[in-house]
Amino acid sequence: MSPAGEHGTAAPIEILPVAGLPEFRPGDDLGAAVAKAAPWLRDGDVVVVTSKAVSKCEGRLVPAPADPEERDRLRRKLVDEEAVRVLARKGRTLITENRHGLVQAAAGVDGSNVGRDELALLPLDPDASAAALRARLRELLGVEVAVLVTDTMGRAWRNGQTDAAVGAAGLAVLHGYSGAVDQHGNELLVTEVAIADEIAAAADLVKGKLTAMPVAVVRGLSVTDDGSTARQLLRPGTEDLFWLGTAEAIELGRRQAQLLRRSVRRFSAEPVPAELVREAVAEALTAPAPHHTRPVRFVWLQTPAVRTRLLDAMKDKWRADLAGDGRPAESIERRVARGQILYDAPEVVIPMLVPDGAHSYPDAARTDAEHTMFTVAVGAAVQALLVGLAVRGLGSCWIGSTIFAADLVRAVLGLPADWEPLGAIAIGYAAEPAGPRDPADPGDLLIRK
């Protein structure tokens, strides 16, 4: 990246076509052909050449069948071979990333401006191709020029294509204005100009697509060679805001939703927006339930004094129960300390089984089965709530403690006698955020009959 200063020029620039070039074939000397057609090149010029011309000279042509369907089948096979990942699909068009990090349609595989019995691939190393052409022109003409290898690309949010640099040598491909101040005194914090792409687009105005003019020269710019290449123009997928197409991003979100749920035991102090909890609860209430009922209620402990009173009472009961088991005091305190998460979490919600709509049976077996069915339904709603929180960036941890103190929970919270607490859910932003977990191997946990 070039240092701060103006990347443009107030003086006129020229964009000159290089006429008289042959139809290039594998093995041709591109540098010699350009030197012969443009002996007028001089120091500081920028030679802009289409990647197609470079590919032809470097033998990056693949024989293709004349039949349109077979040709298209081969093209798709080549796209698969050249691409390292697919970012987006629309109809039969694939937007891909190739091994160099270039993101464009069809991995640069192209059937234009080549024979109908051929398909062209991008150069293996466009930056190396640019450096080689620059060195060859220096050898033949004794001039110091910059070289850009270009290809046609679409642009996010805008119709139409433009040429962009895929290979570069001899010029600063980027110009950063960070720290510079404009004429109004405003500091330019993030402005960074893709000089190489601007030059590539300008040169295409004389190269065109149907003129058989694969090389142009841009003259009049102040070119600085900082050793950068076109690779510096590529933003890695991990840093790019648009590294997937819309449909693909939605699909990834669907596939990762379950995997985002983790048991988070340490939360940051950041407050939890109430609307996020309400939204997650609303989604959780769509979980499957028997008899078209709503067998779950979520009790949100929003009043700090109420939460503390409940947790203190549960702690006292837990201590008494453990002491009754004959456990030593040190062991009791370790076990009781595990419940501290419910004091520390920004929010706590208690899921309740509510038997409204449950069927009555004269025998214990079916009555127990009905209760089990309602319990499973509440469990489904709890899992749905945890996932709903996770997809909103909230961590959670389900803790079963209230199950062991059902009467106490009902008494402290003033709830009906037939409401059954099924644990407690601590909610907050994770102190140490983590990504989606890996799926488990079903192994012998998935039984086939």
Swiss-Prot record:
GTP binds at residues 21-24, 51, 56, 113. InterPro entries: F420-0_g-glutamyl_ligase, F420-0_gamma-glut_ligase-dom, F420_FbiB_C, FbiB, Nitroreductase, Nitroreductase-like. Binds 2 divalent metal cations per subunit. The ions could be magnesium and/or manganese. Keywords: GTP-binding, Ligase, Magnesium, Manganese, Metal-binding, Multifunctional enzyme, Nucleotide-binding, Oxidoreductase, Potassium. One of its GO terms (molecular function) is coenzyme F420-0:L-glutamate ligase activity. Pathway: Cofactor biosynthesis; coenzyme F420 biosynthesis. Coenzyme F420-(gamma-Glu)n binds at residue 321. The keyword Magnesium applies. A divalent metal cation 1 binds at residues 110, 151. Residues 246-449 are annotated as: Dehydro-coenzyme F420-0 reductase. A divalent metal cation 2 binds at residue 152. Its cofactor is Mg(2+); Mn(2+); K(+). Residues 1-245 are annotated as: Coenzyme F420:L-glutamate ligase. It comes from the Bacteria. Bifunctional enzyme that catalyzes the GTP-dependent successive addition of multiple gamma-linked L-glutamates to the L-lactyl phosphodiester of 7,8-didemethyl-8-hydroxy-5-deazariboflavin (F420-0) to form polyglutamated F420 derivatives, and the FMNH2-dependent reduction of dehydro-F420-0 to form F420-0. In the N-terminal section; belongs to the CofE family. This is Bifunctional F420 biosynthesis protein FbiB. The gene is fbiB.
